[in-house]
């Protein structure tokens, strides 16, 4: 069961300026399409590892086919054998009953793929590789105002860093949680959640949000 929240309320209330977004793990481009409904003039770039989705990506906007990670190296890449169920493809194999086959793929870092570029918001939905990508290009990440990440408290992808580990690392480098997009629950357990983080360390960024702003309550619920 997926519990949806209203992340764009945060952006609207705080009048957050977003001029550019990077959609990593774009799949068929649906996230970018939804984001553009709220920020129609935003400049977007999608990165997707699966070439099967090129036709969908072309209809959405600019894209690059690439597999991102912590280093420039070859890695095992797991592909779902069911072509209609490709959202689980990635470096960390799903801990499910779904059959996957493994191939070898060239992996690259954000710094190597997009040298000198920066984006106001970076979204990642990469089956447990979020922390690898962040650690592989810390300077690139430091230039982002916001990170929109899929995280996994449950061991959904074998060997992938847990949500707690990712959140702890982000706190160390100056990113704090501000809101939630969705929580995916199965058998009473949180399988995954999409969380949004603000960069509070890079003072040169105009995030539109003051994490220390006093909260004004109109009243407490009884």
Where are each of the predicted segments found?
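Phosphate/nucleotide-binding beta-alpha loop and adjacent structural elements of enzyme active sites
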Residues: 1-222
């Amino acid at each position: 069961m997926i519990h949806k929240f209203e992340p764009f309320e945060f952006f609207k209330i705080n009048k957050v300026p977003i001029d550019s977004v990077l959609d990593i793990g774009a799949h068929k481009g649906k996230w970018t399409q939804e984001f553009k409904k709220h920020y129609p003039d935003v400049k977007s770039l999608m990165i997707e590892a699966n070439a099967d989705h090129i036709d969908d990506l072309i209809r959405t906007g600019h894209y690059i086919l690439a597999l991102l990670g912590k280093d420039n190296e070859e890695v095992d890449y797991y592909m779902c054998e069911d072509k209609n169920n490709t959202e689980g493809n990635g470096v960390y194999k799903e801990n499910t009953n779904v059959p996957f086959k493994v191939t070898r793929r060239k992996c690259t870092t954000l710094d190597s793929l997009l040298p000198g570029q920066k984006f106001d918001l970076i979204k990642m939905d990469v089956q447990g590789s979020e922390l690898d990508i962040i650690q592989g290009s810390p300077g690139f990440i430091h230039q982002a105002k916001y990170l929109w990440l899929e995280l996994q408290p449950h061991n959904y992808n074998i060997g992938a860093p847990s949500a707690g580990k990712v959140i702890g690392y982000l706190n160390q480098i100056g990113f704090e949680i501000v809101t939630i997009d969705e929580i995916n629950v199965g058998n009473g357990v949180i399988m995954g959640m999409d969380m949004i983080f603000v960069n509070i360390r890079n003072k040169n960024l105009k995030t539109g949000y003051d994490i220390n702003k006093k909260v004004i309550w109109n009243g407490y619920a009884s």
